[in-house]
């Protein structure tokens, strides 16, 4: 390592861990990462450009100052590519200094760009805080955990604007998306462990994904216990997760390492679930096909869940949840009809029993009959009445009220429907029903 740097010391000892973390950031989609030489080149170049602050140690405050000055520099046409590399490397070092873990150089640039976009909003917020705390330190690493003049720190709740912005990103891009990870990594550097976990729990998202995230956090906790035996100066899992602490206690300086570990665990869990979601054979992507029976769908789903590297309780939860949410529409309706309100908690066996007839010929005929069944006419009009006589049960063209039978002379029916005609088939037609014809003649002689 060259003998040049802050305060003329060998290298940059204050950035030893930061450079080590920065070397894990990928340059692009491949496996190539930044090297220690890349970081030293960027730092030495910046010290050469801005000689007025060369002797100052590389704190986060100096990085912000250099970043603002670097934006005002206009590079020559032949050195634009090197200038872009210089900015990108500085962005990665700044993210590592703030405790963030971006996967790629582009992600680091996105985090710094997002911070620039929020700079105007932060200025108004800082003015209000400075009015309340005139002796507030300029270093903003742990804000809103504010350092007080009398000693100690005070805790400030997460603002509603920040919470709503995180909610919007989670709804638009997903709970385990890279956009949500960047937003959370930016804001959560100033939160307590309790703040981080509470905000994550209140975010919108798939319940199965939340269970997987919780499972990954439990795995990180178990790994911490194995690698760090209990001791006087060893953090416990409860301290890291903020269990049994008030916000005031969690905001103190002795909990800084616990907050950083909690945020690191959450970021690791989000990335693990995201990689799991995009991996072939992911159970959450297995859905029932149109021509597939429910039994075949369940067989594929259970096989995929059993191969997942998660704990048994999470596997059980995924089986119960995905067996309903990933089923076809017909099966979901059938389960709702049979199981009712307990459909979400019902076992896989109960759901298979409820859907055993879905897809059969009898089930298809039942659906067809329901579709062809005429709707019941129920309304204010009621039963239709005859416009001629006003009575219900027939139309005006079928009304018999004004009809006279030409056989019996009675009203209400036609001659073809006359019962008297049917009962006496030998009766004469025409006027014979009136009796014998009277022939006029003179009276008898007395």
Swiss-Prot record:
Ranges of compositional bias, category Polar residues: 423-432
Gene3D superfamilies for this protein: 1.10.1200.30, Human Immunodeficiency Virus Type 1 Capsid Protein, Immunodeficiency lentiviruses, gag gene matrix protein p17, Zinc finger, CCHC-type
Database matches in SUPFAM superfamilies: Retrovirus capsid dimerization domain-like (SSF47353), Retrovirus capsid protein, N-terminal core domain (SSF47943), Retrovirus zinc finger-like domains (SSF57756)
PTM description: Specific enzymatic cleavages in vivo yield mature proteins.
Protein keywords: Capsid protein, Host-virus interaction, Metal-binding, Repeat, Viral budding, Viral budding via the host ESCRT complexes, Viral release from host cell, Virion, Zinc, Zinc-finger
A single Gene Ontology CC term: viral capsid
Homology family: Belongs to the Ovine/caprine lentivirus group gag polyprotein family.
Domain observations: Late-budding domains (L domains) are short sequence motifs essential for viral particle budding. They recruit proteins of the host ESCRT machinery (Endosomal Sorting Complex Required for Transport) or ESCRT-associated proteins. Nucleocapsid protein p14 contains one L domain: a PTAP/PSAP motif, which interacts with the UEV domain of TSG101.
Protein name: Gag polyprotein
